[in-house]
Amino acid sequence: MRSDMIKKGFDKAPHRSLLKATGLKDEDFDKPFIAICNSFIEIIPGHKHLNEFGKLVKEAVRAAGMVPFEFNTIGVDDGIAMGHIGMRYSLPSREIIADSVETVVNAHWFDGMICIPNCDKITPGMMMAALRINIPTVFVSGGPMAAGKTSKGEVVDLSSVFEGVGAYQSGKISEEELKDIEDHGCPSCGSCSGMFTANSMNCLCEVLGLALPGNGSILAIDPRREELIKEAAEKLKILIERDIKPRDIVTEEAIDDAFALDMAMGGSTNTVLHTLALAHEAGLDYDMSRIDAVSRRVPHLCKVSPASNWHMEDIDRAGGISAILKEMSRKEGVLHLDRITATGQTLRGNIAHAEIKDKEVIHSLENPHSEEGGLRILKGNLAKDGAVIKSGATEVKRFEGPCVIFNSQDEALAGIMLGKVKKGDVVVIRYEGPRGGPGMPEMLAPTSAIAGMGLGADVALLTDGRFSGASRGISVGHISPEAAAGGTIALLEQGDIVCIDVEERLLEVRVSDEELDKRKKEWKRPEPKVKTGWLGRYAQMVTSANTGAVLKVPNFD
């Protein structure tokens, strides 16, 4: 066993003595040592219940004849961090989480690991660590939140609250109505109830094969999630016995399948960023053009909030992720069904008995929302290395208009609220990329303000930053190269005409190459917004969005 490094031999007497101080007995040194990587944090509703989950996982690990050791990671609630400097720490927290998990697990030579994540950057951070460490691992998330209902019976979620702010600002609802939405938008523990980033990543974790069937859709408060925890411990023991590791599971084909599910569900654009980072950790050269190839062959089968009024509980009721995958498998070439997963079975085996139970929620191949996926990769002179749009969250497929430029999210939100943006405009928010932000903050407040004011179909928004999974409308993010790297987005001037063509996958500014070259020569890189602390270091090390915004290792040659 890997853990023999710290528990076997006469020279490990000091190690055993320390371990006995934690409560271990001599007989425990013949059992596998299991890291329980938890993320219990009281300020995050998706993680508030995970202390109880941790106890259940430890009980299940002991029952399976192994020895559990629980530790915790940090986390950031993107909703609470939204709209202020806290959002700059969100994406960078992914790297801290990955590094901290790597540190604890490799320092103590565990034989296997069960990860308990739930929300936005915590799930991908742990997944990155699992691929980096590469010991048998199973994920079991905290589960989605239920949708809420206002006093009038209207189904609401967190995106409803953000959009309610814009609706109140424009006089469309009263303060009392906004308070009603606020009070009922987040009714329980769990990850926010729509197809936002947290749920998108937990669903992708399931299809990748690192989590068990049901992980993405079973609600946090559903007793079936406790059964999932017990099964996770049993499956981990099998993975250890068979020496099946994360890098055996997360292959190029698995990543194709993850993006295929993402396209079928119209998941968060953040999944592109995080899954590219996973490919990097797995040692795979996975190009963004491959994502677009997946999008072209995968139909969009279900729309979940914010693209519809359906929520994760509806997906679960309709058959869950397995039902979506089973339907997708009917189309040749969409999924790689014979690859191994954390169940010890193939993907084909995992979904063999699944079926769609509500075709209003999960459409059939014969009745898709669209023939192509709900995410698209755009390229052009404004995004030479690519950009991402959640095409499933807007009916508008082509938009052209003059750009209104803001050099920060705060500046943009103030401008939108003051009426500086009108129908037909293309809002540009730049210098908010991985390096320029720093931290590539999400633009949920501006998109929600635009939607809440009734301009969601009449105003486009471009940024080198990110969008929340709760964002909708004509929102193009992850523009690469970013402004801070001298990308074309930095060269735009007020009134330049920008064209977004979703069907043709184009993002262009109607300015000649000669004029852009002239502007590039005159452009000067702004001073970094942050020069000290973690964000200062992050800005110096982070790479572009088109490579997953991972940190580059300095070259010491």
UniProtKB/Swiss-Prot annotation:
UniProt-annotated binding residues for Mg(2+): D78, D120, K121, E442
Keywords tagged on the record: 2Fe-2S, Amino-acid biosynthesis, Branched-chain amino acid biosynthesis, Iron, Iron-sulfur, Lyase, Magnesium, Metal-binding
List of residues binding [2Fe-2S] cluster: C119, C192
Enzyme class: lyase
InterPro entries recorded: Dihydro-acid_dehy_C, DihydroxyA_deHydtase, DiOHA_6PGluconate_deHydtase_CS, ILV_EDD_C, ILV_EDD_N, IlvD/EDD_N
Active site: S468
Pathway linked to the protein: Amino-acid biosynthesis; L-isoleucine biosynthesis; L-isoleucine from 2-oxobutanoate: step 3/4; Amino-acid biosynthesis; L-valine biosynthesis; L-valine from pyruvate: step 3/4
A Pfam family it matches: ILVD_EDD_N
Free-text comment on the cofactor: Binds 1 [2Fe-2S] cluster per subunit. This cluster acts as a Lewis acid cofactor.
GO molecular function annotations of the record: 2 iron, 2 sulfur cluster binding; dihydroxy-acid dehydratase activity; magnesium ion binding
EC number(s) stated in the UniProt entry for this protein: 4.2.1.9
Top-level taxon of the source organism: Bacteria
Family to which the UniProt record says this protein belongs: Belongs to the IlvD/Edd family.
Subunit structure: Homodimer.
Cited PANTHER family: D-XYLONATE DEHYDRATASE, D-XYLONATE DEHYDRATASE YAGF-RELATED
Known role: Functions in the biosynthesis of branched-chain amino acids. Catalyzes the dehydration of (2R,3R)-2,3-dihydroxy-3-methylpentanoate (2,3-dihydroxy-3-methylvalerate) into 2-oxo-3-methylpentanoate (2-oxo-3-methylvalerate) and of (2R)-2,3-dihydroxy-3-methylbutanoate (2,3-dihydroxyisovalerate) into 2-oxo-3-methylbutanoate (2-oxoisovalerate), the penultimate precursor to L-isoleucine and L-valine, respectively.
The protein, known as: Dihydroxy-acid dehydratase
Organism: Bacillus cereus (strain ZK / E33L)
